[in-house]
Amino acid sequence: TGKVLSIGFQPRFDVNMQMIKKIVESGELGEVYYIQTGGGRRRGIPGGTFIEQDTAGIGALADIGCYSLDMVLNAIGYPKPLTVSAYKSDFFGKNPEMYPEDSKRFNVDDFAAAFIRLEGGIILDFRISWAMHMDTAGDTLILGKKAGLRIPSTECWNGTVGGPMKIYRDVANEPVCYEVPILPDYSGMGLFDKKIHSF
């Protein structure tokens, strides 16, 4: 058709995010059966056009949640979702004591969670937040039949993992853990530049 499609999630162009996909595709983890992912902020509702359904559509889920979902779904080849059970709330954004200026306009989610069954028998446990009474929604875990991968609590929407990743597996029938160090990026380009060059 002469058309070119580029999936423009900038974190996909980070060397450490790419390592997640390489680990999964290498077979290091074996068949993946469970993923836990998400993220969020203790306080971080952006305001402006982000908090109104007419201009944003949805809140934290679309603003930052899409990056966590893409990080893991891209790594496992985007299997089709079969069923979704989801929940959302707006306890913080609508609270005038916390957000006196914006609470009256706030009509999107500031927290969302979902339990998603994917093709291939994979379970995806997802949660995302703009505001919560917690410092993190937890690390990302990818569990396979041969090994598991822990990705430290990440702000993947900024294009980074939260620290060295760890792989858990058995060696000679003993449980071991080893670290995947943070990789340096020698390209000399930012994520946006890499995205443009890949198009």
Regions found by a protein language model. Give the residues of each.
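Short loop/turn motifs at secondary-structure junctions and domain boundaries
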Residues: R105-V108, M132
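Glycine-rich phosphate/pyrophosphate-binding beta-alpha loops
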Residues: R127-T136
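Predominantly a Rossmann-like dinucleotide-binding segment in NAD(P)-dependent oxidoreductases
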Residues: K3-S6, P11-R105
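Short beta-strand-initiation
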Residues: D109-F111, A137
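Active-site-lining helix/loop region of Rossmann-like oxidoreductase modules
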Residues: Y78-S85, A113-R117, I122-I128
